[in-house]
Amino acid sequence: VVGSRKIIPETQSVVEHFIKSFKKKDVSIVSGLANGVDESAHLSALENNLKTIAVLPSSLDNILPHSNKNLAYEIVENGGLLVTEYEPGSPRKPENSNYIARNRIQAGLSKLVFIAQSSIPGGTMTTAKFALDFQKLLAVYRSGENFDIEEYKGNKYLLSKIDENFDYKILKFTKKQIEIFQNKLALADF
């Protein structure tokens, strides 16, 4: 589950609903521990007793963002994981390439990548590209009335690719479809 650091209330609700869909299922939620959508995904996973994996752009001795350090500890205390390719003592201020590497790892660890909210450009779009390159299933939230706002421009762009006969596995999710998905998952046997 990935998206903007500047989460809007609609997206907050969507992330919570989407993750709640997996309650009582043997799945782990992967995200990047950033503020906004990532933070919401990890918190929702913990609230629903799901394991969560936080992929870091930094080393374990320099958890970023610092504001989510306690969340990182809570993830581990609840059986989740912190994943990084940087050893302790790595530079304190990660370079842009660290975030791109984090996005690559997130996509690689996931069977399905859910884009909750994305503007253009941004790290979320990088994660979407990795997901498609790795032939992962990509699910993109499609807002109803707010779909033309800046916060969903990345979502809109990705969903436009569905209609261009691209050989991509992109799913569109509206809030109603997430509820239907929740009901079907409740009946599914993983």
Where are these regions (language model features)?
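Glycine-biased, small-residue-rich flexible motifs in mid-sequence functional cores and linkers
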Residues: 2-190
